[in-house]
């Protein structure tokens, strides 16, 4: 069956960009002076930017989870030992400079930045609705900032490219300092913070980035930099002024199809099957579900660790929506989950799509959105920033809001007709936190982020900005007597290596990170 790419943000319009554009392997590209003349040209270019985060095989989403979770104490690589061996290198901190997953991350994010630069450079002079063109420019700035944030937090300083350039020109650009990259990110996101709110877009544009996305990424940037003062101000704006978001009443709702792009969702990648005879949607759930259940065709990657499981209170109902277990059976499935090939006995609930919720004739392409940022993330960042700014009473308010929602979550999953384990949740489960001790509250908030956002790709980000990545990983290795984490070197492993292929193309103008 011929694979057809559908427009990510136009929600039904076939994208007319050529395959050479979509598959471009490097981070420089030739642009045509005659192309970006009309509003429709800019819209098409912006759609091309969004598509870098959602191509047919969803390599960005896979990379997001492999880097963000599998290189931490939350997730094992999973699958068979030889399958995607480069992810095992990430997991064990034995990463070579030729690692395919590392190179893939670099390529995808620079393709995203490239497309954004085309929009930003040409939108101001294009013919059409000037207000709409200005919005397109701000969307591109928000996406470019997301790309650079994802690069600088994993590679450190990188080439800072803010205008369309030829490949030959790109190859002469050295790495900018991390400070310079962060300055550009903050500038872009500050400008994009005046984008429309989540509810102000037309239905056909409901997945476009919003002011909430821009402000959330701005807050994450400040938090990563340890600038809690500015982070608090931005987060206060999101939570107390804009009020564009809220928590769903039940934690488990976040992964049910009827709640896609819900009031809690700040950013997600849509993967819709519009025509059951055309292979669209996403294949990520197949990578992350069990290899032993007919109809799932899973590869068994992204396996929750025992350490993550042990981080939960025994009566915390969120366990139901983080771990699938042998014996769980979803309504409509003929067979219960069988996780005997999983090293921990668990698989990733948040990427499990049962038969009753699948659409299309191609079982590899599932109508399922990738949830990247939720409002509970913002509330916990806000609690953390407030605590660091010596406002523990305010911090507890937002921490306890997240815990209250968890406490009131149904521990019995309505998507299942058999559930191997049901937490004994009561009204006294996850009681409100009362301490006002700054150090104690910090540890509690960090723990709450882990169990609330488990398997959602943000664990590495948290451990890095908390300056305890090595400490946590070495403790993990010692606790379980495993290789994972034992090799962690603080001078090396906070950053990934600059891909050797990119260094070769630049004639080593791109310098390498320490100890690689």
Can you name each region flagged by the protein language model?
Residues 20-84, 182, 190-196, 208-342, ...:
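An aromatic- and glycine-enriched ligand-binding surface/loop that stacks and positions planar moieties
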Residues 84-94, 310-375:
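Flexible, polar/acidic helix-loop-strand segments at domain edges
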Residues 144, 211, 218, 375, ...:
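Structural register within alpha-helical repeat arrays
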Residues 1-28:
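Bacterial Sec-dependent N-terminal signal peptides
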Residues 20-24, 50, 74-81, 95-99, ...:
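Long, intrinsically disordered, low-complexity segments
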